[in-house]
């Protein structure tokens, strides 16, 4: 006689094993999926695409999502964040307002680069050297400071600079690429331009530029850090180890940005990874 109770028990046990296996498989798959949030800034674009290329070489599935910095900090602070990590946090100054708002719900994983600077930039042929000299040459600059997105920390710092130095200038909101295009046109025509700038950025290699002196100390020095959502390291330990070890010298970061600028985001990152595979694989 067929023992229905025994068969039912076997079926239940099999179902439980299959279910647990599916759960473990899903967890394993999720551990190999990483979502990187990044801003439209040259170093953020370059580093994020390098991370994508390097992790995909180890069978990770990587998604890149472009957002303004404020939205990135806010998204990563959510309990059910759609993102995992952000490689371009400028702290402790430039992104300080975002860290004050969201830092308690974020994890600082490490520092990629020390010595990030921001300020107002002019071509070297412009014969002024200080922010304090801008008002005397308002007409040559058309009364405009060419900026980037309003969500960027340097945008807020420049509003403070306008106030601190009592500048009769307007900050023009654009984007990182649009700002570079404006500098390129001005340099081509040898016209005057003042723009928000930062290092590291590939524009310093492409154009002969200089910072204007900032005697009031509006623009500080920062490090570039890796910020993640809470629980990222527990959920995806292999990916987390890679990001915690992600470090670049100034020379390496400039070379990476230059490769991306000249060859495109994916191709440039792949070329730089191939040439520096030992370095990058050492982060894994």
Model-identified regions with their sequence ranges:
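C-terminal motif of bacterial Sec signal peptides marking the signal peptidase cleavage site
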Residues: 18-22
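Short, well-ordered beta-strand elements
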Residues: 28-43, 60-65, 142-146, 243
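Short helix-initiation/N-cap motifs at beta->coil->alpha
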Residues: 41-42, 63-76, 171-182
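Pocket-flanking alpha-helical
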Residues: 48, 68-104, 181-182, 202-208
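Ligand-binding cleft/hinge of the Venus flytrap
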Residues: 51-59, 136-172, 274
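A conserved helix-loop-strand patch within extracytoplasmic ligand-binding domains
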Residues: 103-150
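Short beta-strand->loop
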Residues: 105-113, 192-196, 205-220
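A bilobed periplasmic-binding-protein/Venus flytrap-type ligand-binding module shared by bacterial periplasmic
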Residues: 117-127, 222-236, 242
């Amino acid at each position: 006689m067929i023992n229905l109770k025994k068969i039912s028990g076997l079926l239940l046990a099999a179902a439980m094993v299959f279910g647990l296996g599916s759960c473990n498989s899903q967890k394993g798959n999720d551990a190999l999926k990483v979502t990187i949030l990044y801003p439209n800034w040259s170093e953020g674009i370059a580093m994020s695409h390098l991370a994508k290329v390097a992790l995909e070489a180890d069978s990770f599935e990587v998604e890149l999502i472009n957002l303004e910095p404020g939205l990135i900090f806010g998204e990563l602070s959510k309990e059910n964040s759609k993102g995992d990590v952000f490689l371009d946090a400028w702290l402790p100054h430039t992104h300080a307002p975002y860290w004050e708002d969201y830092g308690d719900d974020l994890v600082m994983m490490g520092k990629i680069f020390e010595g990030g600077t921001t300020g107002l930039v002019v071509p070297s042929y412009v014969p002024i050297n200080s922010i304090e000299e801008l008002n005397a040459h308002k007409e040559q600059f058309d009364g405009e400071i060419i900026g980037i997105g309003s969500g960027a920390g340097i945008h807020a710092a420049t509003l403070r600079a306008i106030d601190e130095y009592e500048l009769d200038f307007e900050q023009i909101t654009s984007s990182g690429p649009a700002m570079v295009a404006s500098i390129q046109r001005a340099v081509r025509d040898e016209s005057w331009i003042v723009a928000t700038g930062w290092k590291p950025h590939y524009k310093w290699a492409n154009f002969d530029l200089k910072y204007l002196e900032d005697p009031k100390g509006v623009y500080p020095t920062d490090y570039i850090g890796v910020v993640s959502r809470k629980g990222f390291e527990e959920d995806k330990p292999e990916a987390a180890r890679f990001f915690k070890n992600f470090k670049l010298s100034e020379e390496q970061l400039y070379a990476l940005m230059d490769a991306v600028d000249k060859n495109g985001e994916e191709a440039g990152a792949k070329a730089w990874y191939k040439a520096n595979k030992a370095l990058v694989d050492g982060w894994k």
